[in-house]
Amino acid sequence: PSTSACCYASIHTGVPPQVHGILSNENRFRVEQPDIFSEVSKAGGKTGAVTHSYWSEFFRAYPFDLVEDMEYDEPAGPITHGRFHTMTGYNLKNQMTPSDVDLFATLTMLTKRHAIDYGILHTCTLDSMGHRFGHDCHEMDHACYAMDGMLAAFLPRWRDAGYEVIVTADHGQTDRGHHGGHDDEMQDFALYYFGAAKGPEADTLLDQLQLAPTVLSRLGVEIPSTMKAKVFLR
């Protein structure tokens, strides 16, 4: 399903929801399969996450403790440096989303202060705007424009620091602001890569399950046997 939590777990484990078991946003627990965080940490690397709290629940510990888990630095943990938000109280009139520039700055801080080897930044802004307004509208045009400008200010800094960058999404969305099904507009989304690797042709249709093994391969980390999808960057 093109549901957020299901996609989060698949992006990092490289297995479908039917295998990792996260089948809805309400069905959450610490997943059992190896994931990007666990494998990078096992290989001696440092990881960082600036994301919704679901990522902490799936890849560190469930349930999420609002006080203890909002920020942590754990040298021995799968997520070495975590900075999270919950969006508690979210509804169509109050999105409860942090400013994206704050998230970009926080991830950049982790790269500078802790020299993380792998980091993920997750924002719900465009998803929430789509749910509220749909897509063919001035509000969404401006949201995409604003996000683009914020990202443009940080992307060169990450590249100058030696990082390869993948910009993508967990799912698509209909013009009514819905996702969760199997229609192309719910499942298809863009992927942009900034780095030295060679990738497929621009119109290639990739599988979301390819992300985890591809990221590990770029980091020089052994890919676990559970991640069976083909690496797409060389």
Where in this protein do the model-derived segments appear?
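Active-site His/acidic residue clusters
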Residues: A105-A153
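Stable alpha-helical elements in mature extracytoplasmic
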Residues: C7, E32-I36, L103, D136, ...
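Short, well-ordered beta-to-alpha junction loops that form the rim of enzyme active sites
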Residues: T51-Y54, L121-T125, T168-H171
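Short catalytic/ligand-binding loop motif for oxyanion handling, primarily in non-cytosolic enzymes
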Residues: S56-A61, D127-H131, T174-G177
